[in-house]
């Protein structure tokens, strides 16, 4: 909402129709206008190359498993303008909660639910390396330590 309130055109993408409806309702209640679409962050054909000045990952990257992460980062790079910025909000580091520790695949850095990969929790350095390998420069990093797992905020720009 902050960006819309300050005059920016805002787009939101989520796989879940429920999340899109929730965002639309929040913006409508605040009397703000934005564009929300059900879509896949790993495949954004509705957007042109070099279209956005800023892309904000609202805690999405850690929800992606395996190669989907690289596809997402490649799409972000494709639609981000030169000198544009990419803000990432992602769970990182191994879990702290004993229940989650028992369900954490330390080799793949994945939190499992019912035996299936559910979230990716990479160590901070591995997350930074992954983002750099996708041709982003990391400009700033902030870690919030939480009782269940740590959360990284990265500000990046495309190389």
Which residues are covered by each model-predicted region?
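A conserved beta-strand element that flanks and buttresses the S-adenosyl-L-methionine
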Residues: 56
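Short catalytic micro-motifs in class I SAM-dependent methyltransferases
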Residues: 59-63
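Class I (Rossmann-like) S-adenosyl-L-methionine-dependent methyltransferase catalytic domain
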Residues: 1-46, 64, 68-71, 75, ...
